């Protein structure tokens, strides 16, 4: 498992108090992990802080799953 995926999973588990077994790359923050729109904003802010990147609002709208977050962060930090 990649370092980025592990770090994203840790953030999601902590922020959403999610079951670690449910936090997979395909897991939707809203549909699978019970997040609401405010949770999504807080997750994006946590990703920005953890990885020292900026996620524009238009990009943040497309980050709906753990895998989406990992892909975006991987591209920004490459």
From Swiss-Prot:
Keywords: Cytoplasm, Fatty acid biosynthesis, Fatty acid metabolism, Lipid biosynthesis, Lipid metabolism, Phosphopantetheine, Phosphoprotein
O-(pantetheine 4'-phosphoryl)serine: residues bearing it: 37
PTM section of the record: 4'-phosphopantetheine is transferred from CoA to a specific serine of apo-ACP by AcpS. This modification is essential for activity because fatty acids are bound in thioester linkage to the sulfhydryl of the prosthetic group.
GO cellular component, one term: cytosol
Subcellular location: Cytoplasm
Residue ranges constituting the Carrier domain according to the UniProt record: 2-77
GO MF assignments: acyl binding; acyl carrier activity
PANTHER family per UniProt: ACYL CARRIER PROTEIN, CARRIER DOMAIN-CONTAINING PROTEIN
Record's function text: Carrier of the growing fatty acid chain in fatty acid biosynthesis.
Name listed for the protein in its UniProt record: Acyl carrier protein
């Amino acid at each position: 498992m990649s370092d980025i995926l592990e770090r994203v999973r840790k953030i999601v588990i902590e922020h959403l108090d999610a079951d670690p077994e449910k936090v997979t790359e395909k897991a939707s923050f809203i549909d699978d992990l019970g997040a609401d729109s405010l949770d999504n904003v807080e997750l994006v802010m946590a990703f920005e802080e953890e990885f020292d990147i900026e996620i524009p609002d238009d990009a943040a709208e497309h980050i709906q799953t753990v895998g989406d977050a990992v892909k975006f962060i991987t591209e920004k930090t490459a």
